[in-house]
Every structure is written in structure tokens, then in C-alpha cells.
Amino acid sequence: MDQNEHSHWGPHAKGQCASRSELRIILVGKTGTGKSAAGNSILRKQAFESKLGSQTLTKTCSKSQGSWGNREIVIIDTPDMFSWKDHCEALYKEVQRCYLLSAPGPHVLLLVTQLGRYTSQDQQAAQRVKEIFGEDAMGHTIVLFTHKEDLNGGSLMDYMHDSDNKALSKLVAACGGRICAFNNRAEGSNQDDQVKELMDCIEDLLMEKNGDHYTNGLYSLIQRSKCGPVGSDERVKEFKQSLIKYMETQRSYTALAEANCLKGALIKTQLCVLFCIQLFLRLIILWLCILHSMCNLFCCLLFSMCNLFCSLLFIIPKKLMIFLRTVIRLERKTPRL
């Protein structure tokens, strides 16, 4: 049995309480992003095996401890269990081990991703985090970007503001905008500065959560096992069954949420189309009204011109007759020579 697992149910199984100053952190995310190296940077020692490359060296969940100020830091490193497509026996075994090592619950989940390379695999890993720990775990999650050196001295906030990766922006928003960046090659004061920045972010999160760690039904099941090792094998089996059911429930919840999101988007699209049709009809009606008004004006103008013409036709002959009569009278009065 691993020294970090004092029983089937982890180090707190026999009723011992975690220290108030203990800070439990779980490293999550896809393989190859630098999770283990990030854990080493936080603890400032080679606690987890790590090297450059996309192949993971972490084969199983492991735990290491260190300190920062007056806090004892407990970090749980995880293997490639967030990228597996199949829900196989190995996945359930590692998830169960992760729960045991992090009982009674993590204060922080560090979702590690590489700066500038948030891919569909990272999205799948983030989705698996929700399946394993629950949707509410996002409220205790900080997105940690590795390869901070790629910012070239720029601001991480500016990077996020300028990013056109909608999936990444959605993830950061779900995590309450909590982000941090690491250069896992940093040493000395540079390493201390970036760890301090992360710890400040964690302290803000803990203040927001009133110092409470994250928990769910599975952690509660672990805590209920504090009565001792009696029937421990049955309890382990019970936990596994509960874990499978929990993950299936989370998948169903996610699928339902996505369906509702698509349904909402469809409804919004339909409303937008109806609004456009209504606006188009209103414009047509307005155009017809204007055309009708112009026709009425044209008809009135035409009628006035016809009336004027008719009046002129009536007045001109009359004036001509008067003129002719006048001429005739003048001729009659003029004496002949």
C-alpha cells in the first residue's frame, strides 16, 4: 500500500482531521502540458518525474507535500486519465485513487494547459474534469498556463483579451476568470515570484469560498467511512459503483446542458428570423403607404392641371369673343374715306 494511502480510504479514513493550514491541490488536464513540472515548481523540488515531450511519465496518481508560508501544501499529480476516450477499468481505478489521495476534498483544481495551444484535446480534458468531479468543481478551478516565456514579457490578461479561441474563453469564464501562468524552467527569485502570484490567486479563491474545500457526494461517501476498516473491501466496491453512477450522471447532465444550449440557440435564431420577417413586412407596408401617398399627390396634381387647362379653355374663347366684338365696334365707328 502506498504511504500516502493509510487505508482504502486515504489518510483521513480513521477520523484524523486535516490541518487548518493544509492546502490540497489537484493537477488536472491533458498529458504533455507540463502538469508534473508545474507541481515541481510549486513545491520547489523534484517531487514528480517530469521531462519535455508529449509522452506522460506519470502512470498513476501520486501525492507530494511542501510548504509555503504557514501553509502545508499537498499536491496530487494525475496521469493521462483526462484524455482517455473509453471509460475503462483503469480510468475508474485512477479516479478512485485520486479521490482517496485528495480526501476530504481539494481546495483548488489546477487545470494545466499550454499557452497558445488550447486544442480539442484540452477541451475534452476539461470536459472530463467536469465528469469526474462535477460541474460545480469549476468554482474551485484555476486555469494554469505553462510556457509563460512565450508571452515575451506581455500580460496574460492582454493575451486572453486578444485571444479568438472561444472555447478557451468559455473555460476561463466558467472558472470565474481565474488564470495564472508558469515558466517551468524558471529558477530562484523568478520561480518564487510566479509561485507567489499563484498562491495569491489561490488565497483570493479561498477567501471567496470562506476557506472551504470542494466536496461532492463521492467525497462525502469517503468521509462516511471514518468508522474504520470493517468491510473496507465492500466500501471500496460501493465507492466504485457510486463513481461509475456519478460520472454517468455528469455526462447526462452535460449532454442535457448542451442540448438545452442548442435548443436555446435555435429558439434565439427563430426569434431573430421572425423579427427580421416582421421588420421586412413593416418596411414593405411603409413603402406602400409612401407610394400610395405619392400616387394621391400625383393624382391631385394631375387633376389640378386638368382643371386649370379646362378653365383656360373656357376663358380664352370668352376673351377672344370680347376682343373680336371690340374690334368690330371700333371698325363701325371709324368713318370711311
Curated annotation (Swiss-Prot):
SUPFAM superfamilies hit by this protein: P-loop containing nucleoside triphosphate hydrolases
Gene Ontology MF terms in the entry: GTP binding; identical protein binding
Main location: other
InterPro entries: G_AIG1 (IPR006703), GIMA/IAN/Toc (IPR045058), P-loop_NTPase (IPR027417)
Binding-site list for GTP: 31-37, 50, 57-58, 147-149, 184, 318-320
GO cellular component terms listed in the entry, alphabetical order: endoplasmic reticulum; lipid droplet; nucleoplasm
Region called G1, residue ranges: 29-36
Region G3, residue ranges: 77-80
S-S bonds: none
Coiled coil: none
Highest taxon of source: Eukaryota
Region (G2), start-end ranges: 56-60
Gene3D superfamilies recorded: P-loop containing nucleotide triphosphate hydrolases (3.40.50.300)
PROSITE patterns, A to Z: G_AIG1 (PS51720)
GTP-binding found in the keyword field: yes
Keyword field: GTP-binding, Lipid droplet, Nucleotide-binding
Chain spans, region G5: 183-185
Protein location: Lipid droplet
Domain AIG1-type G: 20-223
Tissue: Detected in T-cells.
Segments of this protein annotated with the region G4: 146-149
PANTHER family found in the cross-reference section: GTPASE IMAP FAMILY MEMBER 2 (PTHR10903:SF7), GTPASE, IMAP FAMILY MEMBER-RELATED (PTHR10903)
Functional description taken from the UniProt entry: The heterodimer formed by GIMAP2 and GIMAP7 has GTPase activity. In contrast, GIMAP2 has no GTPase activity by itself.
Family: Belongs to the TRAFAC class TrmE-Era-EngA-EngB-Septin-like GTPase superfamily. AIG1/Toc34/Toc159-like paraseptin GTPase family. IAN subfamily.
Description of how the protein assembles with itself and partners: Monomer in the presence of bound GDP and in the absence of bound nucleotide. Homodimer in the presence of bound GTP. Can form linear oligomers. Heterodimer with GIMAP7.
Protein name stated in the entry: GTPase IMAP family member 2
Origin organism lineage: Eukaryota, Metazoa, Chordata, Craniata, Vertebrata
Gene of this entry: GIMAP2
